[in-house]
Amino acid sequence: MLSLQATAKLVVAANTYSKNIHPILKVFGLWWKNNTLDGPVKICNHCNQIIVGEYPMCFNHGMSMDVALIRAVKDHNISLVQLFTEWGGNIDYGALCANTPSMQRLCESLGAKPPKGQMFMDTLIHLSDTLDDNDLIRGYEIFEENNVLNYVNLMQLKIILTLKTRIPLMEQLDQIALRQLLQRYWYAMAVQHNLKAAIHYFDNHIPNMKPFHLRCALYLNDPFKIHDACKTVNMDPNEMMNIACQQDLNFQSILYSYMLGADINKAMLMSLNHGNLSNMWFCIDLGADAFEEAGALAGKKNKRALQHILGLNIFKQELIPPCKDPDPFQIQLLLKNYTLKNVSTIFSYYCQ
């Protein structure tokens, strides 16, 4: 049950007041000031989101009660930690990111379980497994610049995060900071499962994530996400193709990159180098003819049968002209129930 004081503050925070009342709100404990925030604490009557300042829309500027509590803990704002806990924030989340003994004691006095070892990893995995917008945002806020991560097995954590998402988070495990890895992890999970509120939140709070959004869309073979991302990201078509070729059966991403002007012969060789043979045959369908180089590469990989097949002069190409603005609907329609033409050609050749 809320205390009388917390109830009174809840009523005040749920209403709108003129700037003349701001000094009273500061005295009343409904003001939040730090490096990025400076304004009255308000609560949306419709979605229970916390808003700080004079913003009319909680979708762009609001935060859940748990996220507000987590940020208050990181700010060492004792009065707001107590208030948000009374209003329904989960103090256990606050305890997981308390970075001083005094703040840890405060969280425990408010009912938090003392965090221990595996609890941090269990929470991280749980919040990403629920596939819920708010849980991904909670996870990001808890572990963003969390000192406890200085004491975890870094390589083990990187491997776990990489295995949990279908999208490559980095080029090499040892060439990315943990903070950036976690940011990419939360973002990749949001894009992978189309959690739009989480994507919107991360776009507003994590700098320079638009190029990674495009990488995710290419890897996930989603022409509509690719099309949207290309409106704000200027990436070289050959770089896009390189990403598309890393996952087999990524025909829509390959076709989109090809239509933008990516080199289809390079794509054929990249696909073979990654061992993604369906992609390689699709590139041949689109007009790739680097058969000599591909045959040599197949020989180096000890794929003798493939090397022999690539030496046959039987392949046909379906040339699709490049265009500046590919249509994702057209791409999806072209590839609906698509069968690899030149794989069928090979079967016909050997079954004569």
UniProtKB/Swiss-Prot annotation:
Annotated protein name in UniProt: Protein MGF 360-16R
Protein family membership: Belongs to the asfivirus MGF 360 family.
Lineage: Viruses, Varidnaviria, Bamfordvirae, Nucleocytoviricota, Pokkesviricetes
Biological process according to GO: taxis
Keyword Ion transport: no
UniProt entry tagged with the keyword Secreted: no
Coiled-coil region(s): none
Induction or repression: Expressed in the early phase of the viral replicative cycle.
Function in brief: Plays a role in virus cell tropism, and may be required for efficient virus replication in macrophages.
InterPro entries the record matches: ASFV_MGF360 (IPR002595)
Keyword annotations: Early protein
Highest rank taxon of the organism: Viruses
